[in-house]
Regions:
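Transmembrane alpha-helical segments in integral membrane proteins
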Residues: 59-67, 130-145
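Transmembrane alpha-helix boundary/anchor motif
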Residues: 22-23, 89, 93-96, 139
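Interfacial loop at the N-terminal end of multi-pass membrane proteins
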Residues: 1-72, 100, 106-116, 120
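Membrane-interface loop-to-helix entry segments
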Residues: 47-49, 124-131
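Short helix-capping/hinge motifs at transmembrane helix termini and TM-loop junctions
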Residues: 32, 66, 94-95, 144
Length: 145
C-alpha cells in the first residue's frame, strides 16, 4: 500500500510541476494584463510548492523506512532531496525577494520601475531552478520502483 501511495504522490507532484509550468506560459501568452498573469502563476507555483514539500517529506521518509541507509545510495533519494531543497529555496527564498521587489515598486508595475533589472535577475534564477526541478521530476518518474 505504501508503495502505491508513493507512486500516486510522485504522479501528483510531477504532474503539478509540469502543468503549472504549462499554465504559466498560457497565462502570460493569453492575458493582456501581465500583472494578473503573474499573480495567477504565482498562486499556482505556491500551491505546487506546498504539494512538493509534503510529497518530498513523504517520499524521503518512505524511502528511508523501506531501505534504511541504503536509500542514501539511490538516485531517487538524492533527486527528491535536491527537489526539496529547490522548493525550499524557491518558496521561502526567491519568492519573498520577488514579492518584496514588487511591493517596493508600487504603485508602478515592477517591470516599469527601477527594480526591473533585479526582478528580472531573480525571476531568471527562479526559472532555472524550476526547470531543473522539472528535469529532476523526470528522474523520479524513471526511478520510481
Amino acid at each position: 500500500m505504501a508503495y502505491r501511495l508513493s507512486l500516486i504522490i510522485i504522479t501528483l507532484w510531477v504532474g503539478a510541476l509540469w502543468m503549472s509550468g504549462i499554465s504559466a506560459y498560457v497565462l502570460f501568452d493569453t492575458l493582456q494584463d501581465k500583472q494578473m498573469a503573474g499573480m495567477l502563476a504565482g498562486k499556482l507555483f505556491s500551491i505546487v510548492s506546498y504539494i512538493g514539500l509534503g510529497s518530498a517529506f513523504y517520499l524521503l521518509i518512505h524511502r528511508v523506512l523501506q531501505y534504511g541507509t541504503a536509500a542514501l545510495k539511490q538516485g531517487f533519494f538524492w533527486a527528491v532531496l535536491v527537489m526539496l531543497l529547490l522548493v525550499l529555496a524557491g518558496h521561502f527564498g526567491i519568492q519573498p525577494i520577488l514579492e518584496s521587489l514588487k511591493s517596493q515598486a508600487l504603485p508602478a508595475d515592477v517591470m516599469k520601475s527601477v527594480f526591473a533589472d533585479r526582478f528580472k535577475s531573480w525571476h531568471g534564477i527562479a526559472n532555472v531552478a524550476y526547470v531543473f526541478e522539472c528535469l529532476l521530476a523526470l528522474v523520479l518518474v524513471l526511478k520510481a520502483r
